[in-house]
Amino acid sequence: MNLTVGVSDMKVSDDPKSVLVTYSLGSCIGVAIYDPVARIGGLLHFMLPESSLDPSKAKKNPYMFADTGIPALFKSAYQLGAKKQRIKVVVAGGAQILDQQGFFNIGKRNDMATRKIFHRNNVIIDHRDVGGNVNRTIRLAIKDGETSMKVSGRGEKKICLI
């Protein structure tokens, strides 16, 4: 059963029938996590790097920002039984789609914020596909952790994390 993760949204599951999917990651970033022992996975689709840009929005929806969404994703996975030392991580998105001149560089700023958060928390990113000017879609199957990424113009590829 597909569970769609929208923009500024997050889902975590331990149901082996679930497949988490987020579509059209442009400048946004998708973070997929999976604990292969507990068979718990989660997917976050955030828009902006820092909640300090709009603290009131971050309070209403922490999944909008990297610095509030990523910790919330991990916390939700831990509550279901995932362990930090076993978690595998896939990061995708961070493209420069609309802002071709690079004035805002939201995609690049999102990527930098993501890498900083993972580095600061001693979490390794197992697979990273970011930048460029293409949209990406991520799927995460909870039963086995199979992760696939569809990239505009490049087709779909499976990412083996276990």
Regions found by a protein language model. Give the residues of each.
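Active-site microenvironment for binding and transforming phosphate-containing groups
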Residues: 1-162
